[in-house]
Amino acid sequence: MIPTDGRHARRRSPWPIALGAGILAVVLVAGIMVYAALRGGSRDGFRGGEVAQVGPTEPAPTLQEPPPLENWPRWGITHTQYSADNEPRQVAEQARGVLGRVPMLQNQHIMGWGVGNPEPSPGQFSFHDLNRRLTFMASSRAVPVITLCCAPDWMKGGQAGRTDWSKNHTVAPKREHFDDFAKLAARVAKQYPTVKHYMVWNEFKGFWDPSTNRWDAEGYTEMYNKVYDALKKVNPEIKVGGPYIPIESNARTSNSELAGPWGTVDQRALDAIEYWIEHKKGADFIVVDGASMTNDKGNVPDDFAAQGKFGAITTWLRQKSGDLPVWWAEWYVEPDNSGWSEDKRVAVQASAMIEFARSGVTTALYWNPQSKNEGECSGCLWTPGRGEEMPMAGLLSGFTRWFPSGVRLEEVQSSDARVKTLAQTQQLVMVNTSDKDVTATVDGKQVTLRPYEIRWAGRGGA
């Protein structure tokens, strides 16, 4: 299996934005056409790809039931190309402890991001990788989530029995195969009866229409409705959500109904969401993803204030959807080549999570960028190959324990605006958004926080 990136790249617009890129494309087209003609027999740009690996049929794993919880955890992670199930046993055990000490949501895609092609040929299933990943999730006390993406090549114009991984993230199922994709979704649901939450597709991949310069919300929604019906037929208690579309923004102003100091949202994403809201068969939650960074100027007006975008979008989604639970399937806060220290990285993440909690997000899933090799792993939850806990793991555990969905927040005053706070009856978290020591009175007590320090403090509530 050719690896898919363990971490999504910095958000890029799906349409050309640079003249230089356009000129380069023109130069390359002729060569590509000649190459394609020599290859012959390819369809929709699919190369032959590798032969999909299909082993002996395995019985469905017997998975532990998710732990009973008083509140929905709200916080969690998405497993990517490399995760704990790919690590040596000792490292996997340490990661299991990091993830399981406070049960949180854990999400896995059905194709790519660590697992192979689930149905290489029509009716021929291969769940070995997915079984392994779901088994680890259950062993680490996960509340499991599955993302129904991506789709086998034969549903997208490629060859049955082969997988062209270069097309995994760029091509959607053809309309004549929407029913086949829905059947695959139902087969997955039957394979893993302990999984009760499904997100349909990922980032509208393959649903951008260059001829109209907008998202193909009609095509996506048609596919979504078929998947929704198929999953509910397997088990009416299964929760299903979409449209899982990326919401991009720009610093420059444009015609959009949603804007703030953090930028202006691309109206085309909002239009696609509203189409889905109006034409969906049903939904148990609404899913989006996005970055605090604008496409043209990074984080504006600064790295911390830019996180206000998440709260503003969440409020808009709740209003437009009739207050459906809002899920952020991914969120990103760090510009390319930022040079941030790990302390600043985690402080900005904490600021984003405060925005999520204050705006009433039901679920926020952290895209865990684990890597294969030992060495620097910025933003990871544990050190690759060693299993040592990294700061982001503690942040997620703390928010999961103290700020699950439904917890009642309390207002806490800080005498210095550089110290952001989030509080409930029993616990307070403070974030120094400055690169300097800050002394402030918070919740009636004087504190001094180091640069970018995150500090938890008990409040003594019942």
Regions found by a protein language model. Give the residues of each.
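C-terminal region of N-terminal signal peptides and the immediate post-cleavage residues
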Residues: S13-W15, A30-T57
